[in-house]
């Protein structure tokens, strides 16, 4: 397995797909990285030379990926919570942040239902 940005990428897949295993690199970014490194998208990872791997690593080192990106995202969320913005409050309460309806759905964000017992009349 080739190791890029601290992640073991699968050898049997095409390079453009394998690069998406790195957090912060999707299909589009992977295509741009390969274009800049001068590597064909159809090449399998096992067929890459050390020189090509080095070029890919150099291009990816310029990007914010893995730990740095995760840290930046968490700091952004922490900042929203500290300034008390609407989005920060939604993050703190564990509710949807982007305006989705939360009366009936939003189960992914809210977690499993907590049933409330009925009062006897």
Swiss-Prot record:
Gene3D superfamilies: 1.10.8.50, 30s ribosomal protein s13, domain 2 (4.10.910.10). Residues 106-121 have a biased composition (Basic residues). It holds the Pfam family Ribosomal_S13. Transmembrane segments: none annotated. InterPro entries: Rbsml_uS13_C, Ribosomal_uS13, Ribosomal_uS13-like_H2TH, Ribosomal_uS13_bac-type, Ribosomal_uS13_CS. GO terms for biological process: translation. The keyword rRNA-binding applies. Keywords: Ribonucleoprotein, Ribosomal protein, RNA-binding, rRNA-binding, tRNA-binding. Residues 93-121 are annotated as: Disordered. Signal peptide: none annotated. The keyword rRNA-binding applies. It comes from the Bacteria. Coiled coil: none annotated. GO terms for cellular component: cytosol; small ribosomal subunit. One of its GO terms (molecular function) is tRNA binding. Part of the 30S ribosomal subunit. Forms a loose heterodimer with protein S19. Forms two bridges to the 50S subunit in the 70S ribosome. Belongs to the universal ribosomal protein uS13 family. PANTHER family: 30S RIBOSOMAL PROTEIN S13/40S RIBOSOMAL PROTEIN S18, SMALL RIBOSOMAL SUBUNIT PROTEIN US13M. Located at the top of the head of the 30S subunit, it contacts several helices of the 16S rRNA. In the 70S ribosome it contacts the 23S rRNA (bridge B1a) and protein L5 of the 50S subunit (bridge B1b), connecting the 2 subunits; these bridges are implicated in subunit movement. Contacts the tRNAs in the A and P-sites. This is Small ribosomal subunit protein uS13. It comes from Bacillus velezensis (strain DSM 23117 / BGSC 10A6 / LMG 26770 / FZB42) (Bacillus amyloliquefaciens subsp. plantarum).
